[in-house]
């Protein structure tokens, strides 16, 4: 059953934690991204987890292997249930992240999910320096590498889920950002957006929604409506 | 005159701030990387800056443009004097980072330096998924893009400084990690290491040294010895 992840895209902890509080009893996951984490640090992860949510710490690590191993270890110890890395960082970095995941879990007692970023969903064909191959094919080949390197799944556009599942197996998880009830570009960076129903039909396991929930007049109602749309899709 | 940056590669704030305290009056810069920042958040940047150091917040942002803009803004507001992004993130992301830099500086009153990561110094030829061109050439072309997109400089191996300066001009700054007094691989990730004297001779503007200082019996003495070696090089 696909799960909803609400992106807490706020510049400060108080507003983010307040929003999470208003969403209790709706989506099971909250996402803490770079802007919020750079402003608030690991305390905001703990605060959101303490409200009963599972937390996706979306920092997209991309550094030398030893640093990524340490960063994942720290992220796990902060209470994150899901973390991610860039697969463009290569095999040694990815395997170091897997090691950091398990080292961190020795402190917390549970092993979080480790996702790989293939191609950012904001990236259009021709925008990847040095990469001339088809962007969908490049993303699928990175996903296959991620599966081979021991990751749990990948962040990818809804349009790539089917080919990734075919190539990496149904149990290899897909998390899809840029979900928009009613589809249509939201005027932000996401280039390849989908509706919740489309993404669930495509086979995505986690759907990330930001402004359409957190910017709604009644965020909890908006979240419940999206979850109802998701549940109505027969897979 | 090239400047020394000491990498505070520690898993917790107390140890890192203690080390910075022991290094007062030696290196002008301290570096806070992903592992320390994920454990401690922006408070550690302020604590190190309050000791009188300039702080390089080395998080290597690589996300959708809007998120990187917000992350750089938050990083600047935390008191960082230098931040960095991956140039593999492309032009839109890089230009969004430049916007975030100036937005953040409206709060702090000074515009930090924005550096681009070309190819991680831990990456060997053939390890970059989808990139078959020569790694030095790929790094130099990314550096040229970074200069065109408005960055202050790039993180690069000492072996690439000359070609980058030739291509981007002497005022385009180069920061070189993996510096080792006496050279020789240090058993960690860095693949293309140099001595302080070699890096200064090559034209590098900032030299990053980690364990050779922070792991020394007398860190302050180790830092001073490296700075003396740097100063002795005639450019």
Curated annotation (Swiss-Prot), chains A, B:
Substrates-to-products reaction catalysed: orotidine 5'-phosphate + H(+) = UMP + CO2
Root EC class: lyase
Gene3D superfamilies for this protein: Aldolase class I
Residues given in the record as substrate binding sites: 9, 31, 58-67, 121, 180, 190, 210-211
One cellular component term from this protein's GO annotations in UniProt: cytosol
PROSITE patterns (alphabetical): OMPDECASE (PS00156)
UniProt xrefs under SUPFAM superfamilies: Ribulose-phoshate binding barrel
Any GO BP: 'de novo' pyrimidine nucleobase biosynthetic process
UniProt cross-references to InterPro entries, sorted A to Z: Aldolase_TIM, OMPdecase, OMPdecase_AS, OMPdecase_bac, OMPdeCOase_dom, RibuloseP-bd_barrel
Function: Catalyzes the decarboxylation of orotidine 5'-monophosphate (OMP) to uridine 5'-monophosphate (UMP).
Complex and partners: Homodimer.
NCBIfam families membership: PRK00230.1 (NF001273), pyrF (TIGR01740)
Entry protein name: Orotidine 5'-phosphate decarboxylase
Organism, scientific name: Nitratidesulfovibrio vulgaris (strain ATCC 29579 / DSM 644 / CCUG 34227 / NCIMB 8303 / VKM B-1760 / Hildenborough)
